[in-house]
């Protein structure tokens, strides 16, 4: 299937996919366009491990991009499948996994289509920095809930929608500090935690805990915090029955 065909998927934004495809070759440059993703990645792993061990678990990484999180999960002992609709980015993910000899099963497919044929298959589903880039985040959340096993864990991360998140995640991060490429985010697509939780509960997921990601511009360091006002992560569990 061509990228043009993938762009027509009901829950794909062609401009978002094209933007990420254009940046595909910079995905693994830790000082480049996606440097911030590399820096927060250890925090994402740390957050997941608070609730579920990774070793020997079946894991689905939704919107895996170039594979930053997928590879880390695999190196921690997970049996990882990464899915995305950006073809060039997924090619980079596959090539990098070969270079690093890290086993990740990558597939060019939507979350919704994958969940149809892999229902209740995964111990863990992750969907990081992805919901704010799709037209219908609720559809992704429902697909994640469908793919995870009863009693399994689903982890989301996205951006809160408020004045502070606009100032820090768009104006400061994109325009001033160049932490992420200009045009990466659209403030209207940001999702408040209460909105995400309502969608997750409708999908049969139950909130266990949340955490924020805070950036210190002087030290250029990220840390987990209890404030969810800008970048945040939420941990959900599917009912065991």
UniProtKB/Swiss-Prot annotation:
EC number(s) for this protein?
2.1.1.222, 2.1.1.64
Which GO biological process categories is it annotated with? methylation
Give the UniProt keywords, A-Z.
Methyltransferase, S-adenosyl-L-methionine, Transferase, Ubiquinone biosynthesis
User: InterPro entries, alphabetically?
Assistant: SAM-dependent_MTases_sf, UbiG_MeTrfase
Q: What class of enzyme is it?
A: transferase
Instruction: Provide the binding site for S-adenosyl-L-methionine.
Output: 44, 63, 84, 128
Reaction catalysed? Answer: a 3-demethylubiquinol + S-adenosyl-L-methionine = a ubiquinol + S-adenosyl-L-homocysteine + H(+); a 3-(all-trans-polyprenyl)benzene-1,2-diol + S-adenosyl-L-methionine = a 2-methoxy-6-(all-trans-polyprenyl)phenol + S-adenosyl-L-homocysteine + H(+)
Pathway this chain belongs to: Cofactor biosynthesis; ubiquinone biosynthesis
SUPFAM superfamilies registered for this protein in UniProt: S-adenosyl-L-methionine-dependent methyltransferases
UniProt lists the family membership as follows: Belongs to the methyltransferase superfamily. UbiG/COQ3 family.
Q: Under which name does UniProt file this protein? A: Ubiquinone biosynthesis O-methyltransferase
Q: Which organism is it from?
A: Hydrogenovibrio crunogenus (strain DSM 25203 / XCL-2)
């Amino acid at each position: 299937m061509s990228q043009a065909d993938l762009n027509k998927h009901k829950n794909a934004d062609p401009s978002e996919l094209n933007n990420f495809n254009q940046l595909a070759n910079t995905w693994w440059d830790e000082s480049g366009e996606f440097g911030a993703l590399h820096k927060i990645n250890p925090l994402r792993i740390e957050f997941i491990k608070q609730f579920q061990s990774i070793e020997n678990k079946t894991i689905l990484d939704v919107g895996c991009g170039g594979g930053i999180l997928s590879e880390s999960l695999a190196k921690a002992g997970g049996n990882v499948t990464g899915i995305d609709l950006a073809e060039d980015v997924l090619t980079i993910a596959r090539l990098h996994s070969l270079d690093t000899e890290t086993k990740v099963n990558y597939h060019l497919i939507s979350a919704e289509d994958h969940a149809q044929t892999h229902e209740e298959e995964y111990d863990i589903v992750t969907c990081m920095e992805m919901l704010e880039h799709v037209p219908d985040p609720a559809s992704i959340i429902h697909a994640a809930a469908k793919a995870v096993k009863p009693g399994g864990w689903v982890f989301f991360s996205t951006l809160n929608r408020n004045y502070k998140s606009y100032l820090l995640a768009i104006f400061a991060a994109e325009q001033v500090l160049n932490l992420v490429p200009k045009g990466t985010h659209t403030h209207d697509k940001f999702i408040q935690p209460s909105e995400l939780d309502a969608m997750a509960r409708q999908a049969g997921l139950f909130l266990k805990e949340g955490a924020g990601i805070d950036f210190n511009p002087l030290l250029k360091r990220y840390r987990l915090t209890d404030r969810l006002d800008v970048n945040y992560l939420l941990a959900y569990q599917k009912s065991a029955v």
